[in-house]
Amino acid sequence: FKPQFARISLEGFIDMFRRYWAHMIVVFSVYLWKDILDGLDRILMANTQLDMTFLVYAIEGDASLWVQEGLRNDFLDVIMTHFYVMGFMIATFSSFIYPIYFDDRHMADRVSLSMFWVYILAIPFYLFLNVKVTGNYIQGMETIAYDLTPEIHNWFNRIDPFTNGMPSLHIGLPFAIWLTMHRWDEDGRW
């Protein structure tokens, strides 16, 4: 996975933190925002009863139910839930760390800024497009990830309850990173 010119070493990691600390603060500050925005979102939901589920359902219909019924498999349930809980975060943030570690400031600037702007643009949708969990709204739909294990159920309830609508960061972040790498990779390294 590393470019041919790259060498992995402890000194490289130390140098990476020394040279790119501002990039890391920009991207990882999102975790601080998430706690603040989650608190604000819960206050808004409790006081305004915002529910835009009918709008999302008007666009999607029962498509997610058809996908669930067509692809339902116990093995996929476990793999995809665990990938979502850990793999998605690792894949997203390693794509940010990758150009930083290999000292490509041009790409590091663009990837960190694209991730930053995706989060900024998602805030109004996050706060004002609250939706119900799909399994609680669509008749016959199961909340597979919620019900896989008690630990994962607790994680979803506390950290990512799926109550915020479009545009999804789960699509927005990987797409923005891919688009950034595709558009700004001038030397063909990435």
Question: Can you describe what each PLM-predicted range is?
Answer:
Residues 1, 25-30, 91-95, 176-179:
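Hydrophobic cores of alpha-helical transmembrane segments in multi-pass inner/ER membrane proteins
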Residues 1-7:
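Transmembrane alpha-helices
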Residues 9, 29, 64, 94-95, ...:
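Generic serine detector
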Residues 10-13, 69-73, 85, 98-99, ...:
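Short amphipathic alpha-helical segments, especially helix-boundary/capping motifs
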Residues 10-90:
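N-terminal transmembrane-helix/juxtamembrane module of multi-pass inner/ER membrane proteins
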Residues 39-54, 101-188:
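Membrane-interface loops
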Residues 82-99, 170-176:
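Hydrophobic alpha-helical transmembrane segments
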